[in-house]
Regions:
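Hydrophobic/aromatic beta-strand patches that form the interior of the parallel beta-sheet core
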Residues: 25, 50, 111, 136, ...
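Interdomain linker/hinge connecting the two RecA-like lobes of the SF2 helicase core
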Residues: 11, 165-239
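Post-DEXD/H (motif II) to motif III coupling segment of the RecA-like Helicase ATP-binding lobe
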Residues: 120-181
Length: 239
């Protein structure tokens, strides 16, 4: 990779150097990534890590303990430091969402790994209610195909409309030796007659959602999503 994880944790480290504490919520799409991020946090010596996912039934007690310490901290006591790592699936649940959004909106850093996941479904509906002002979104593929509305909301949430987004292209990464050079070897796979007919029929139905003036889809609804997935399956199953 190009170092997205390390870059974001260095931002958290900088907050620690300036203020003497670290406070972060890290959102990830899978349980595997929860564990990977925990390992990376430990490398930065962020040791107070709480994992919020189905395999950790004690997470709520740990989070409530942090809430208690922050609420009743004496002026001469040090700030509580912590990193909370949650899957998107857990975070969007009502009780979890309310519990994890009760921290200081000015102190806590929100890191969203594979942040394009935030632009759809229940996560998209939650964006407006996430209070934290420090936000970092990480993604190698931030723009969602055929989802202009989701892309707009995501850019607005992370301040990309105000040019606060840093882009590091694959071309630049290869040129600087961060990524290895590689060669493409296309393997042509042709659709059967039945597959092609189904593909064309789905494409015609999808085209009805397309705005010729803007060359885009105004809004991604469930009907369009199902059509796109059905067409995608035809390509993926082609032999």
């Amino acid at each position: 990779g190009t170092g997205k994880t390390i870059t974001s944790l260095n931002c958290l480290l900088e907050i620690y150097k300036r203020n003497g504490y670290y406070k972060a919520i890290i959102l990830v799409p899978t349980i595997t990534l929860v564990n990977q991020w925990e390992q990376e946090c430990h490398k930065f010596n962020f040791m107070n890590v709480i994992k919020v996912y189905s395999k950790n039934p004690l997470w709520k007690e740990d989070v409530e303990s942090i809430h208690f310490n922050e609420e009743y901290r004496l002026k001469n006591e040090r700030e509580t430091s912590y990193v909370i790592i949650s899957t998107y699936a857990s975070y969007t649940r009502e009780k979890v969402f309310n519990t994890l959004n009760g921290f200081s909106k000015k102190q806590l850093l929100l890191i969203a790994d594979e942040c394009h996941n935030m632009a759809s479904g229940s996560m998209l509906k939650r964006l407006a209610y996430i209070p934290y002002l420090r936000r970092i979104g990480l993604s190698a593929t931030p723009d969602r195909q055929y989802d202009d509305e989701g892309n707009r909301n995501l850019r607005k949430f992370f301040g990309a409309e105000n040019h606060y987004t840093y882009e590091y292209s694959m071309e630049e990464a290869i040129r600087k030796g961060v990524l290895c050079k590689y060669l493409y070897y296309p393997h042509i796979v042709r659709l059967t007659t039945e597959e092609l007919e189904a593909y064309v029929e789905l494409s015609e139905r999808i085209a009805k959602y397309f705005n010729d003036d803007t060359c885009s889809v105004a809004k991604m609804d469930e009907g369009l999503k199902m059509l796109l997935l059905a067409r995608k399956r035809i390509v993926h199953k082609a032999a």
